[in-house]
C-alpha cells in the first residue's frame, strides 16, 4: 500500500490516534485502538492509508471512520478502496486456517500467494468532488488497514 502512494505527503489530523510519545513509551496497549492515517497527493490523485491497530491481536467489529480529504480538484474522480483485514488480502489468516503448515504444499502455497494479493473492498466508485473536498464514512475493523485512492485522471 505504501508503494502505491506517491507525491508529497500531506497533513493528517484526527482524534482517535495515539501520539508518538505514547507509542514510543508504551506502544498501543490502552483501552482504545490507534486509528490514524498517512496521506499523499499528486496532480492526478490523492491517497490515504488508514489503520485501526492494537498490540492485542484481537479481531473486532472496529470503529466508524470519517475521512475528509481536502484540497482536491473539483469534478469527477474515481475512488478505489482497498482493504487488508481478517477476510481480505491476508495470507497470514489463511495460513492459520490451514493449520499453520511449516512446509506448505504446492497447492497451499498457491492459495497463500493468491490470498496475499491486495483486494478492493468494493468496486471502484465514480465520485463528484465539490468545494475541493471529499468525505468518506466507513467501518474500519480492528487490526485492519484501508487504502483509499482518489484518481482524477480521465
Functional labels for PLM-detected ranges:
Residues 12-15, 32-33, 45-47, 101-103, ...:
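Generic detector of short, locally flexible boundary/turn motifs and exposed helical patches
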Residues 2-6, 69, 113:
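Hydrophobic, Leu/Ile/Phe/Ala-enriched alpha-helical segments that form helix-helix packing faces
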Residues 1-27:
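Catalytic cores of secreted or luminal carbohydrate-active enzymes
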Residues 7-12, 89-90, 153-154:
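Short, charged low-complexity linker/loop segments at the C-terminal edge of domains
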Residues 27-75, 81-95, 142-149:
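Carbohydrate-binding surface patches
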Residues 128-154:
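Beta-strand-rich recognition/accessory modules
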Residues 10-20, 63-69, 123-129, 138:
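Generic detection of short hydrophobic beta-strand segments and adjacent strand-loop junctions
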Amino acid at each position: 500500500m505504501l508503494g502505491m502512494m506517491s507525491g508529497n505527503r500531506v497533513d493528517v489530523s484526527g482524534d482517535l490516534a495515539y501520539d508518538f510519545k505514547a507509542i514510543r513509551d508504551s506502544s498501543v496497549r490502552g483501552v482504545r485502538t490507534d486509528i490514524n492515517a498517512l496521506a499523499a497527493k499528486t496532480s492526478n490523485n490523492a491517497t490515504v492509508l488508514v489503520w485501526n491497530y492494537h498490540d492485542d491481536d484481537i479481531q473486532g467489529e472496529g470503529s466508524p471512520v470519517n475521512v475528509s480529504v481536502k484540497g482536491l480538484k473539483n469534478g469527477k474522480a474515481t475512488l478505489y478502496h482497498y482493504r487488508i483485514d481478517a477476510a481480505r488480502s491476508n495470507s497470514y489468516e489463511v495460513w492459520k486456517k490451514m493449520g499453520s503448515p511449516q512446509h506448505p504444499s504446492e497447492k497451499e502455497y498457491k492459495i497463500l500467494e493468491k490470498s496475499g494479493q491486495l483486494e478492493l473492498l468494493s468496486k471502484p466508485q465514480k465520485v463528484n468532488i465539490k468545494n475541493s473536498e471529499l468525505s468518506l464514512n466507513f467501518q474500519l475493523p480492528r487490526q485492519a488497514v484501508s487504502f483509499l485512492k482518489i484518481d482524477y485522471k480521465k
